[in-house]
Structure formats: C-alpha cells, structure tokens
Amino acid sequence: MDVTRLLLATLLVFLCFFTAYSHPPPEEKLRDDRSLRSNSSVNLLDFPSVSIVALNKNSKQISRKEAEKKRSSKKEASMKKVARPRTPLSAPCVTTRDSCKPPAPACCDPCASCQCRFFRSACSCRVLSLNC
C-alpha cells in the first residue's frame, strides 16, 4: 500500500509541474515606444496619422445655409407635386388589379380582362397586351 501511495504522490507532483510549465509566461509590460516598436510585428509607421481639424464659424454657417436651401427646395418640390383629383368613374366597373369575382361588374379598362386563379378564388383585372 505504501508503494501505491508513493506512486500516486509522484504522479501528482509530476502533473503539478507539467501544468505549471505548460502555460506560456506572462508578457512583459512595454513602458516606452522604443521597446514597442522593436517587439511589435506590425510597424506603426505604416499607418497614416490622424489629423483633427477644428471647424470655424464660417464653415458652420455655410453648412447651415446649404441645409436650409435643401430643406426649402424639398418643400417647394412637395408643394409642386400636388395630387390631382381623379375623375369619378361614370359606370360601375372594376379598376385594374382589383378583385373581379364573377358577380362583380366588368373591368373599366377596355384592354383589361378578368383573370382568375386557384379555382376562381382569386380574380383580378389585368392588362394582357400592351399594344391595345
């Protein structure tokens, strides 16, 4: 029994040493730029530097003026595009792409015809030929 305990103890010590030495060592902290440049695999001089530019009052006013012009032009364009009222249909008929099941009246467009699908469950007025 003493031999098995001795064997287990040596196995435990071996596993402790193995786990301790198998982990990578902690990296050293780099305190100055020289050591960073020498140890780094990527050269920091390859990347372009970033420059910060402060805006002056004139540039801000120009951008505001441009924004106001854009807003006013959009408002004018929306005012110009006033929706024209549609003329009311004189006869009871079905407009294009509306449902035209058999009890419904005929299609308003003379070039359109009523097409049914799925055993006449979904019917709609469609224009078949563009030359009409």
From Swiss-Prot:
Listed SUPFAM superfamilies: Agouti-related protein
GO molecular function terms noted in the UniProt entry: melanocortin receptor binding; neuropeptide hormone activity
Residue ranges occupied by any Agouti domain in the UniProt entry: 93-132
Residue span of region Disordered: 61-87
Glycosylation sites: N39
Signal peptide start-end: 1-22
Chief place of localization: secreted
Compositionally biased tracts (Basic and acidic residues): 63-79
Gene Ontology terms: cellular component: extracellular space
GO biological process: hormone-mediated signaling pathway; melanin biosynthetic process; melanosome organization
S-S bridge residues: C93-C108, C100-C114, C107-C125, C111-C132, C116-C123
Subcellular localization(s) per the UniProt record: Secreted
InterPro entries xref list: Agouti (IPR007733), Agouti_dom (IPR027300), Agouti_dom_sf (IPR036836)
Domain of life: Eukaryota
Its job: Involved in the regulation of melanogenesis. The binding of ASP to MC1R precludes alpha-MSH initiated signaling and thus blocks production of cAMP, leading to a down-regulation of eumelanogenesis (brown/black pigment) and thus increasing synthesis of pheomelanin (yellow/red pigment).
Family annotation (PANTHER family): AGOUTI RELATED (PTHR16551), AGOUTI-SIGNALING PROTEIN (PTHR16551:SF1)
Record note on domains: The presence of a 'disulfide through disulfide knot' structurally defines this protein as a knottin.
Protein name: Agouti-signaling protein
